[in-house]
């Protein structure tokens, strides 16, 4: 089945700094964009706290979702259309899944999820299948269409070609966010020749492959991703802001659990704190609400909550030192004791933060997170795995890079008016003297 009155009478376009224009010709897509659940993504930043490091990084999940849709639209309408190994009947499914793939992200996304043990993918599925405006639109295609969209996003849909468009090691999701995040942060790392990659993509059996002639463009894409993760996504200042953000949320929950009477009651958090979060509660949360509470809590009587909120709102972040957990745990335990002696709560002010990334991996069947490799289509029709053909990709393939940092409030430990001896020892251990 198809969406009623499938095509718009006139094409709609969004001006876009990455793709120039996002074209909408399908009434299904236009109606999905207009739903309250999709419009909510305007109020969720794509890069969370990164705006405190790169001031231009104010773009939203809404921007990114439109960009992923546009890339997939070009794939199915321009690159794959009419090819014998591509099924045009699943076009609407591809477009809807691309548009809605990030629908369940919450405020400050991964930091928020980590604190409250949530998974945005569960909420994406809930919005698509639940009593929502998005579900009402999808059901106009067919009663089973919402389930198909949810399965594509969850990577369980039967047609793996469709899944790979938005979830693989070279997909529309990554191709959009690398370029978009590079544009808004102002860095040069995320640039690669997407036009070339799209031109050499080919549907084959249960996957999308790349013609071997496009291998160098794919190499640039892989290296762009590597650089963006370590120069932007894992930037130590961004991580400092995330540390403070998570500690604010931890502190607020602890105070609630202890019966603390807030001057500014966190009414939007009650269902989360009490483990009773509903889908309706969740879709009402966005970053403007979170920041409202952070600003209000600057005036709370609890000194820790007030201080952490002041730091986040005014960008007075923690400093850091490199940390090796395999060799320096004894120093960490000593620092913990000294922080307590100095009257500084180490559970909120002494934090080890770790970042890890695997830029590209070959297929490892049976592993917890199987990654389907990128395959090249050679001139004689053979299919070869990318790292077997590219020395550049082979050099980083399967190699996980991990980085650990120890975050602390330099201003507090350099204030010698109270507990000067303990603070002197802290500074010595941190290499500040």
Swiss-Prot record:
SUPFAM superfamilies xref list: HD-domain/PDEase-like (SSF109604)
Known PROSITE patterns for this protein? Answer: HD
Domain of life the protein comes from:
Bacteria
GO MF term list: dGTPase activity
The processes (GO biological process) annotated in the record are: dGTP catabolic process
**InterPro entries in the cross-refs:** dGTPase-like (IPR050135), HD/PDEase_dom (IPR003607), HD_assoc_2 (IPR045509), HD_domain (IPR006674)
What are the residue boundaries of the HD domain, all occurrences included? 61-178
Recorded hits in Pfam families, A to Z, give: HD (PF01966), HD_assoc_2 (PF19276)
The UniProt entry, under SMART domains, shows:
HDc
- This one is known as Uncharacterized protein YwfO
From which organism does this entry originate? Answer: Bacillus subtilis (strain 168)
